[in-house]
């Protein structure tokens, strides 16, 4: 029974890495810098409730930020998000 649980955990971790890793790679510039506008929304680790904006690849969308952690694709206003991420 313990082996089955371990294998299930390894499989779950493998799937999670296969989904997350390409998204992070696609967010990198050729010089190694990360384009924050290509990062996925990340609500962070805490349980606070802040309405923030992130760029979803097309436009800026509201999401709830927990107040700690997350990534830099997080803006206090739609205007700030569009200014940083919208391509003219």
Curated annotation (Swiss-Prot):
Disulfide bonds join 37-85, 60-81. It is found in: Secreted. The keyword Nucleotide-binding does not apply. Residues 1-27 form the signal peptide. The keyword Disulfide bond applies. Gene3D superfamilies: Pancreatic trypsin inhibitor Kunitz domain. The record marks 39 as: May bind Kv1. The record marks 47-48 as: Reactive bond for chymotrypsin. InterPro entries: Kunitz_BPTI, Kunitz_BPTI_sf, Serpin_venom_toxin. SUPFAM superfamilies: BPTI-like. Belongs to the venom Kunitz-type family. 03 (sub-Kunitz) subfamily. This is Kunitz-type U15-theraphotoxin-Hhn1e. The lineage of its organism: Eukaryota, Metazoa, Ecdysozoa, Arthropoda, Chelicerata.
């Amino acid at each position: 029974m313990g082996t089955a649980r371990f294998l299930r955990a390894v499989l779950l971790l493998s799937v999670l890495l296969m989904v997350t890793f390409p998204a992070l790679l696609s967010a990198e510039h050729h010089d190694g810098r990360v384009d924050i506008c290509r990062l996925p929304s990340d609500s962070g680790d805490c349980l606070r409730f802040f309405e923030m904006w992130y760029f979803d690849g097309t436009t800026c969308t509201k999401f709830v930020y927990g107040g700690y952690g997350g990534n830099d694709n997080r803006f206090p206003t739609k205007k700030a998000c569009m200014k940083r991420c919208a391509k003219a």
